[in-house]
């Protein structure tokens, strides 16, 4: 487990009953003491005595609100990379603060992952691909080489993005969807050749 952090205590912002929160506790707790703070309590107390990571992923509006507060107040965040994941080094992959990378991922050389992302297990982020801030990928997602993904995007289980595809902000790709061409409008996409099915 690789954790980039300072010496302050760690708070996971999330719900104790959430499986995502429990995954964060299990991994970070192997080497650090952690406590969970509910989102409503964080909104009342953004103490600079702590460093944070955001485990809220179901209510995406709530997640974005929390992240905006963290960034606007310049609160310290931690970055977690599971030691079973491979991260390219020449040229290096760049992983921004606040991101959590689950086990058995391959983060290829020259790739870039923005702030506050959650990269699910068994993901492949291809060579020179770029993910914006606050992207969440579920298990077994593939983002192929030289693709660009905007901010606040969600990729559900076993969805794929083919080479050199560009995706705008605020896109949800449903499970088993294959994105083969650029996505130029935000919304929800599904199908073997991704098509837009709703606004959000």
Feature-to-residue mapping (PLM):
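Glycine-rich hexapeptide-repeat left-handed beta-helix
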Residues: 138-200
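Domain-scale signature associated with acetyltransferase and cell-envelope carbohydrate enzymes
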Residues: 1-133, 141, 151, 169, ...
